[in-house]
Swiss-Prot record:
Protein name: Kinetoplastid membrane protein 11
GO biological process, one term: positive regulation of cell population proliferation
Compartments where located: Cytoplasm, Cytoskeleton
Miscellaneous field: There are four copies of the KMP-11 gene in T.b.brucei.
Amino acid sequence: MATTYEEFAAKLDRLDAEFAKKMEEQNKRFFADKPDEATLSPEMKEHYEKFEKMIQEHTDKFNKKMREHSEHFKAKFAELLEQQKNAQFPGK
């Protein structure tokens, strides 16, 4: 079965969105058991805030990298389709 560029791109976009959603859900679960801020010392509160920020930055960076890879795969797939078309229909 031949796959069109649109099908391939849509699948990658869907997978990227699913992955980003799963990462966000995982982060929410990870921080769900955070102690009540009222019980934390200022140092521990600062520690939690820094840690949450770091986790979010890494998640954002990872999601961005996944999107970049998807764009690269889309470009390569388009190249392969073009090569295949040129091989099947030379001169067109």
